[in-house]
Each structure stands twice: as C-alpha cells, then as structure tokens.
Amino acid sequence: MLTFHGWYTNGRDFQKWFKMEDHVEGAAFTVYPDSKGPTWDVVGNTDLDFTADVIDALTNAYCIDRTHVFALGFSYGGKLVHHLGCKRPDLVRAISVGDGSWQEETGCRPLPVLVTHRTRDDDELPAWGRNAAQRWAKVNGCSDVPEESDAAHGCVAYRGCKAPTTVTFCEDRHFDPTWPKEWNHTIREEYRSLTWSWFNRVP
C-alpha cells in the first residue's frame, strides 16, 4: 500500500502520524514515499513516473504482487492519488483519498475508488470530496444517485458501476469541540481502519 502525504511534509513524518501498518497488521507492505519538493505534481507525469519507479524498486526487492498495489492519499497527496488513478490505473488495483479534492481531468479509466472526507474540514471542503466521488462515478459508469451502504460511517455507494469497479463516499461527521481547528483536516483512525478493510474487499 502506497501512502502519500500532504504538502510541506514527508513520508517519515506522515508514517509517524498515520501508522497505517497498525491497521494492515502484517498483511501488506506499507510504503510512504517522499515528494521531491514541498508538494506533488498533480497535473503532469513527474510523480506518476516516480510512482512507477517506486513500484518497480519494491517488486525487485521484495515478493510483491503487482496486481495488488493500492494507493492511499491524504490532502494534497489525495490529489496525486486521484491523478494517479485517472492516468495510470495500470499501476494500482484501487485508490482511496481522504480530504483531498480533484481537479477536473479527462481521459480517465475506471477503477475502484473510495473517498472519505471530514464534515468539519475547512481546508478541503466536504463538497469537494463529494464532487470527486461523483466524478469517479461518472468515469466508472455508475448511477448518479448513491445509496446508503454503511450508516455508522456515513458511507454511500454508487451502484451499477462497470465491473469490477466501485465508488464509495464516506463522510466523517465526528466533531470534538476541544480539538484545534486544524485537527479537523485529517483521516481519523477509525477511517484509516475502514480504508484498509475496503481495500481488502476490492475484487
């Protein structure tokens, strides 16, 4: 599982924060790439090629099934993962984006997508997450109107997608008034666990 950090941070710090290996529990490699600058290239090929190189290096060094590479991105890393899923779906089996918007893109190919977003996020507005899920539903040939799939986590799923693709959107409505405002821009641990469970169900 490739896990892409937001801007002005790095893979090591992101690992200390998100600790996705705690949710994977030894079932997969968790990798936290570093961007080459303060942010990712979310419109061009620079970081798409970089991701391909990372996957090549990992499969040469370890026993990794290239047909089961997943990508998770948070914030600006989420923008990259949207871009990766759109332009290079051959590299990943499925993608998940937390609190990350998606610039309008064309020429995307279908693949399974999970989008999660905090209701209280003021950095990346919840509507942007919903819009990203709707765009992927269009790419994947799904229905326009989603149906509730997991009420406890605020999840809805778009039906009728081109097999084997799916699109799920989960809105995290949790609010703690004691939290600093910036803490509302995150993927809470409960939704990190949900993300790994979702990856495990991808056909």
Model-based region annotation:
Residues 4-60, 152-162, 166-169:
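Active-site machinery of serine-nucleophile hydrolases
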Residues 41-76, 86-91:
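Gly/Ser-rich "nucleophile elbow"/oxyanion-hole loop immediately N-terminal to the catalytic nucleophile
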